[in-house]
């Protein structure tokens, strides 16, 4: 039987060394994770393990950030499944990353190697090996978590039985790399960055991280939604139309973005933000596999794809490309929402339907009835 963490509690697991795709070595890696539900293994070696992949600034506590979808009787039913979510390699919520201790006793900082999505998945595979899990019923995730899910399907089809890929593309586009590189530049131009070695200085590059979050958050939401919510309204008690520009006299949307920035700065590490954003820039399912379409066609496990109709970060046509070229497409679903990219996190009713459909399609004999499935191919 696997050695699993107590239910719902943060735990860590040593997984040994990781050799990155680019050739760097990360010794003695730790992966943090949460687990819900009891592990079951069938006579044929299949299991009830569901692996959830979090997005860029997420963490392993999926029952918190996907609270409407993970739990007893919910779409990701912890009465039926053993649900596991890890904190990604390079993160800052328990897994080894730039803010972790280096073997020499200092911080990794700028010495932490560049990683890509495949390195993240390799670390998760070593994590599963370390705790004694050899088969996974399903892996699923959105955005950066969707990129990892897609790589799981390509790298380890003998381990994963099915996958649900949400709100992501087969590779980073020039548009995405440009947006994400601007965020990295905002952090690296903060005078507290110190080339990534700020951990012992007592000063974090908070302004740079906040600026990066403002840029990113606009791509996570829908243009019409933002305009309908804020328009050209001033923030209450402030006047952005005065005779001189003053930073403390803001439009309402500026105040909203300030709030989003402040929240992230309090909970996330700038070094991890740079590391993980760079990993997203490197995302390319076709690299070394004969190109995008050939790589997608070679994926043999059943894959469900879902996207958001108003997503400006990972536009819906990118999920259509996935669906047209995957070797074993299970289904295609569209999330209809003014919210944009974040809809896979916020549109709980639609996501509930999509995920219940996913599990009913891969487990037709289980007590997990489907409502209906939509195909947009």
From Swiss-Prot:
Principal location listed in the UniProt entry: cytoplasm
Catalytic reaction list: L-homoserine + acetyl-CoA = O-acetyl-L-homoserine + CoA
A UniProt-annotated Pfam family: Abhydrolase_1
Binding site for substrate: 213, 342
Catalytic residues of the enzyme: 143 (nucleophile), 311, 341
Pathway(s) it belongs to: Amino-acid biosynthesis; L-methionine biosynthesis via de novo pathway; O-acetyl-L-homoserine from L-homoserine: step 1/1
Subcellular location: Cytoplasm
UniProt EC number: 2.3.1.31
Alphabetic keyword roster: Acyltransferase, Amino-acid biosynthesis, Cytoplasm, Methionine biosynthesis, Transferase
GO cellular component: a single term: cytoplasm
Domain AB hydrolase-1 intervals: 48-347
Family: Belongs to the AB hydrolase superfamily. MetX family.
Annotated function: Transfers an acetyl group from acetyl-CoA to L-homoserine, forming acetyl-L-homoserine.
Name of the protein in its database record: Homoserine O-acetyltransferase
Organism: Corynebacterium efficiens (strain DSM 44549 / YS-314 / AJ 12310 / JCM 11189 / NBRC 100395)
């Amino acid at each position: 039987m696997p050695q699993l963490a107590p239910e719902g509690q943060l735990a860590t697991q040593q997984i040994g060394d990781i050799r990155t795709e680019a050739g760097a070595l990360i010794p003695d890696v730790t992966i943090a994770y949460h687990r819900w539900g009891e592990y079951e293994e069938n006579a044929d070696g299949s299991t009830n393990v569901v692996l959830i992949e979090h997005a860029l600034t997420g963490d392993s506590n999926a029952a918190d950030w996907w609270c409407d979808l993970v739990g007893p009787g919910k779409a990701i039913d912890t009465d039926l499944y053993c649900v596991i979510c890890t904190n990604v390699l390079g993160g800052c919520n328990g897994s080894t990353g730039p803010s972790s201790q280096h073997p020499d006793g200092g911080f990794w900082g700028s010495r932490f190697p560049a990683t890509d999505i495949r390195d993240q998945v390799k670390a998760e595979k070593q994590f599963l090996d370390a705790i004694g899990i050899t088969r996974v019923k399903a892996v699923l995730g959105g955005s950066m978590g969707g990129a990892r899910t897609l790589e799981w399907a390509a790298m380890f089809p003998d381990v994963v039985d099915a996958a649900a890929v949400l709100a992501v593309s087969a590779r980073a586009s020039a548009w995405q790399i440009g947006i994400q590189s601007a965020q990295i530049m905002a952090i690296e131009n903060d005078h507290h960055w110190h080339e990534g070695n700020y951990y012992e200085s007592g000063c974090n590059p908070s302004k740079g991280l906040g600026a990066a979050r403002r840029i990113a958050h606009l791509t996570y939401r829908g243009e019409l939604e933002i305009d309908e919510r804020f328009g050209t309204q001033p923030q209450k008690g402030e006047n952005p139309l005065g005779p001189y520009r003053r930073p403390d006299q803001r439009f309402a949307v500026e105040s909203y973005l300030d709030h989003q920035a402040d929240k992230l700065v309090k909970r996330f590490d700038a070094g991890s933000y740079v590391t993980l954003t760079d990993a997203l820039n490197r995302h390319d399912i076709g690299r070394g596999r004969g190109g995008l379409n050939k790589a997608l066609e070679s994926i043999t496990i059943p894959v469900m794809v879902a996207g958001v109709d108003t997503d400006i970060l990972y536009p819906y046509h990118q999920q259509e490309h996935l669906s047209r070229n995957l070797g074993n497409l299970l289904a295609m679903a569209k999330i209809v929402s003014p919210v944009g990219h974040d809809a896979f996190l916020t549109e709980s009713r639609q996501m509930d339907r999509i995920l219940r459909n996913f599990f009913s399609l891969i487990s037709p004999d289980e007590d997990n009835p489907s409502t209906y499935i939509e195909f947009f191919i």
